[in-house]
Amino acid sequence: MMSYEPAEPVPVEEQPILEKLIGIRQRLAVLKRDRTRFIEKNEVFHLKDELVEQMNLLDSRRSTNSTRTIVDSQLEDCLHLLSLFYLAIGRNNDLPAFFVQLGTVRRLLEYNLEGACYTQNDLKPLKERLERIRAAIVEGSKKEDASPVVVKYLNNKLAVCDRNYSEAQHNISKISPELIGIQTRLVSIHRQIDGFAVRPTSDPGFIDRTMEQLKEIEEMKDSNGMFCDADHVPLQGQELCNGILEECFSFLEDAKTKEGLSDEMKSSPKLQQIYHRLDELLNKLKHLTLTHRWTLRETDLYVYRASLAEIDSMRIDGQFLDEQGNAPAGQRILLYLLRRCYAYIYQLLSSSEPVSEELMAVHNQLRTVKRCLLEVQRSGGICSERDLYPYQMKLASLENLRVNGKFLASDHSVPEGQELVNSLLTQCHQLIEELRDEKHQHDIEEREGSENTDGNL
């Protein structure tokens, strides 16, 4: 289960709903684990219909101020997993596909607010993503098969993200324009220190170099420790910038003397285990960003999100506690690892193409052909028509897979992503024609140059 919150008593009238949700989640999990075949979209649609039925029942039996129970946790688990299935079958623009995206954006915004170490550049892509989701919800709600309860649920989740974004935006909008450059630089240094704390031996000269940068920023303050404008008037945003600067000095000392983990963290097997789990998750997600086009089924991300949610739920008032119930110093590194893991999940979700996994192999091959042709074009073009033969043969072999202009699945159904794949195919043919035309033009210019030279002789 992805959500790990204290269980509240489930009302008697919601018990049947809980049992149904547990059953749906188990079937989704079984489908997720089955790697022997491609995911069939009709199975996903059927499970979605069953889930919507339970959402309608729950919505009809609840008031707006109902206490959150395990029913909500099970529902969110089902919705997040269902959302990943929609991405896996290429239905990226259908409403259920946005549940997991909204959940990830919310997490990132919460971590930004908690750490108070972010810039406008961090918020901008999240805001753009929220606006795209908002537009998709509006468009999706107009369709005949749109479920009102799904639209309502998505709008509620969107509203939470909007509130978090507004708070995050308000916090940095108070920074004076003259201080924005310093704040941006401090945030960058802070993240470099966090990264170094995780890999303390990766750059032996990092500590001295970073200390010099921090001292340089420290010297920009006046004798009263304030960042001021040309008229010696203290700039707005002092507290935020000074807070980040002090944290940078403190964390750099920790990284210098304690190799990333504080003594208190090192003395707690429980916290060391959390650290190593997060570090392992980060490395796996980082690897996925390099290989996902060929190896990732979007539903695989559920396991990572579940692990992160479990770890995050261990915090009490934002702090991880050791075996004695104390919150040791030096926990910033754990928050950094959590945030980085969610950032990689967000990156993987954002890069998901609206193509069914049945078509993904063809899609990836066409992307590779296109990338190779573009590289040939950038490198000066072809030397002869023969240079194009391998690309033409590859395109021909892929085109031969089509039946009546469609790429079919093993059961002869038409998988999602036809337009995108056919568009890539067309682009590859256009690039071949461009390369051929460029070669032809080059030959003409070369002949004309040769004739002019002969004439002058």
Swiss-Prot record:
Protein name as it appears in the record: CUB1 family protein C30C2.08
Keywords: Coiled coil, Cytoplasm, Nucleus
Primary subcellular site in the record, as a coarse category: cytoplasm
InterPro entries named among the record's database cross-references: UPF0662
Protein family: Belongs to the CUB1 family.
Top-level taxonomic group: Eukaryota
Organism listed in the record: Schizosaccharomyces pombe (strain 972 / ATCC 24843) (Fission yeast)
GO cellular component, one term: nucleus
Coiled coil stretches, renumbered: 119-174, 418-448
Function, in words: Involved in bleomycin tolerance with links to DNA repair and/or proteasome function.
Residue pairs linked by disulfide bridges in the UniProt entry: none
Subcellular localization(s) per the UniProt record: Cytoplasm; Nucleus
PANTHER family in UniProt: CU(2+) SUPPRESSING AND BLEOMYCIN SENSITIVE PROTEIN 1 (PTHR28086:SF1), UPF0662 PROTEIN YPL260W (PTHR28086)
